[in-house]
Amino acid sequence: MATDSALINLTHHFLIAMPGLEDEAFAKSVVYMCEHSDRGALGLVINKPSDINLKNLFDKVELPLRRDDLTEAPVFQGGPVQTERGFVLHESMMPGSESVYASTMTIPGGLEMTTSKDVLEALSTGAGPRKVFVSLGYSAWGEGQLESEISDNSWLTVPADVAVIFDTPVEQRYDKALMLLGLQSWMLSPDAGHA
C-alpha cells in the first residue's frame, strides 16, 4: 500500500485531536510522536493523567523515590496499547551519544523514551534525567492509518515544543499545543474540512 508517509515525518511532533475525532479515548488529546515511519507510528498522550502518581508507581515496583519534585507528579495514560507497561519520556542524558539506559529509543529534539526499569532505578536514587514524563501504555497506528486519520481531519500536527510536555500544567497542554499553530480551541469546529 503506497502512502504519503514518505513525504512527511511526524516524529517529534504533536498530534492535536480535532473536536470531531470519533475515538473517545483520544478526545481533546495531545499526542507526542516518538516515532513515525512508513511502517506506522508510536506516540504518548501527554495530557491525560491517570489516578496514580509517581510515588504510587515507585511503591508498586518496590523502589524508593528520593526526588521530592516527582512524588506527586502524575503517571499518564499514554494510550490504549500495553496499558500495564511503563514508558518514560525524558531528556537525553548525554545528547549525541548512546543512551545510558538498556531499552531506549532516541528521538530528535534531545529526548529519549525508555522502557527498561533502569531509568526508574536511576530516578529512585536521585540520579537520572531531570525532566521526565511517565506513562502507562502508548498510542500506535499501523501503516497508513495515521495519514488516513489526518486526511479525515481527525488531527492537527505541529512540531513539538518540549516545554509543553515538561513545563506546562496538564490542564493547559491542549491549549498550549494549539497556540503553537496560532489557534485557540474556540476556533475549531467538529465539521472542519468536510463538505
Curated annotation (Swiss-Prot):
GO cellular-component term (any): cytosol
InterPro entries named among the record's database cross-references: AlgH-like
Matches recorded under Pfam families: DUF179 (PF02622)
Family per record: Belongs to the UPF0301 (AlgH) family.
Domain of life: Bacteria
HAMAP family: UPF0301 (MF_00758)
Name listed for the protein in its UniProt record: UPF0301 protein Bpro_1142
